[in-house]
Regions:
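Flexible, gly/ser-rich surface segments that form the specificity/activation loops bordering the active-site cleft
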Residues: 19-23, 69-74, 118-165, 174, ...
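A conserved glycine-rich beta-strand in the N-terminal activation segment of trypsin-fold
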Residues: 20-24, 41-60, 91-93, 203
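Catalytic-histidine neighborhood of serine endopeptidases
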Residues: 51, 58-103, 110-113
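Catalytic nucleophile loop of clan PA
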Residues: 55-56, 172-193
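Surface-exposed amphipathic alpha-helical segments
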Residues: 213, 223, 270-272, 394-428
Length: 428
């Protein structure tokens, strides 16, 4: 989802608690000794690059945070190091044990010590999706390096129209709070702070507690992850995620949408967010009337500050000339028929593109197409791809369709590209 800010408090004046509900200060006092600030430090200078939060979940010092808080260290352990600071000011080095990229979770371990550490437990109801909508919650973290802060809000259930499982929390989660706990009145963990929605007020998100609990259990029965294994494990998780996603994509219905003289397939699944727009009533009067439809699923898998994946977008725009002659309309379409160039980054190669003309069948218009892809440098057979298709049978109307995918094997990209092109047909 565009507009999500990772590593995301607004402190409201305390009100007298309702009967049976603990005061905010009681919740904080009960959790304080389990709280951590987690810092990714630049190795040489020791200055923080990323600051987040975390919380201890067992007496031996196992702690939960977000993957994106430790992502730089995970990918570049020679350039960064991990450090924690607890509520008493104790600090030390952290060991990265495991992560769940799709859930944006990581497990770290604090150094051993003689005295057992205070630990938070998971709310059993949260492990079964049993938290009631509207139930009061408290989110804790260290926003903007200002010190540990507690924020009161409400549990608003799982987010609709999202492929990734997230809980909507109506409380302010600010930068630095990512990885901190969201607690129930029983002072047990119901979720992990992960993000806020930019452009909205008190729209924040939690990773459901069951994902953190599952990661903890796996870590207790498996050997700790060696740093040299991190990239390979990330690649495995990305590969597993995209295979599951495209299998789910095959299981949904695809219905033809009508665009003037054409039809084009659109996904029918709750986890797609679809919007439509038109400029027909704009002023001044447009010379070309456009009607657009866009469907997008954005699970926003954060791999690194230079690499986010997990997006699929399908867009169709029907264009009808009002005042342009055929030559002018062709020039207008040429300007619209373009894909942004990608020269490559530290994490991906530059784009390579192929253009041509195709017609899926006798019932389909001929399409001018361009297909672009760039590969992930760190992960084999994973690509970002974009496909653009334009009808070319008329001097006064046209359909421009776009498919964009981030994080796909080439075989899955070709399969989705074929489905996309074959879905563009004449309207009967």
């Amino acid at each position: 989802m565009r507009g999500l800010l990772l590593s995301c408090a607004l402190l409201w004046p305390a009100l007298a608690p309702a009967e049976g509900v603990p005061a905010t200060e009681q919740v904080f006092a009960g959790a304080r000794d389990s709280l951590l600030q987690i810092r990714t430090l630049v190795g040489e200078g020791g200055r923080p690059s990323i600051i987040g939060s975390g919380f201890v979940v067992d007496a031996d010092g196992l702690a939960v945070t977000n993957y994106h808080v430790v992502s730089q260290y995970a990918l570049e352990p020679d350039a960064y190091r991990l450090e924690y600071v607890d509520a008493a000011g104790e600090r030390g080095v952290l060991q990265l044990l495991a992560f769940d990229l799709a859930a944006d979770l990581a497990l770290v371990r604090l150094p051993p010590r003689q005295a057992p550490r205070a630990a938070l437990t998971f709310d059993p109801r949260a492990l079964e999706d049993g938290i009631a909508k509207g139930e009061r919650l408290w989110s804790i973290g260290n926003p903007l390096d200002l010190g540990f802060t507690i924020v009161e809000g409400n549990h608003n259930g799982r987010v609709d129209r999202s492929y990734t499982d997230k809980v909507h929390f109506t409380g302010a989660i600010n930068p630095g709070m990512s990885g901190g706990p969201a607690l129930s009145a029983a002072q047990q963990v119901v979720g992990v702070n992960v993000a806020k929605l930019l452009g909205g007020e008190l729209i924040s998100f939690l990773v459901p507690a069951r994902y953190a609990a599952a990661l903890v259990e796996r870590a207790r029965t498996q050997p700790a992850l060696a740093l040299e294994e991190v990239r390979a494990r990330l690649g495995q998780q990305l590969e597993q995620w995209q295979q599951t996603f495209f299998a789910d994509l095959d299981g949904i219905d695809w219905m033809p949408g009508e665009f003037g003289d054409y039809r084009a397939l659109e996904p029918q699944a709750d986890w797609f967010s679809c919007r439509a727009s038109t400029n027909a009533d704009d002023r001044p009067r447009p010379r070309v009337v456009e009607r657009s439809s866009q469907c997008v699923v954005n699970s926003q898998l954060f791999v690194d500050t230079e690499l986010s994946t997990g997006l699929l977008q399908i867009a169709h725009t029907y264009m009808q000339s009002r005042e342009l002659n055929a030559t002018q309309f062709a020039a207008f379409l040429t300007q619209r028929f373009s894909i942004s160039s990608n020269r490559g980054t530290r994490r991906n190669t530059g784009s390579r593109c192929v253009d041509g003309f195709v017609a899926a069948s006798a019932q389909a218009p001929e399409l001018k197409t361009v297909w672009c892809a760039h590969a992930y440098k760190d992960f084999a057979d994973l690509y970002d791809v974009e496909l653009l298709a334009l009808t070319r049978d008329s001097g006064e109307r046209a359909l421009l369709s776009r498919l964009a995918i981030r994080g796909t094997s080439y075989a899955n990209a070709l399969r989705e590209g074929r489905r996309f092109l074959e879905g563009i047909q004449w309207r009967p």
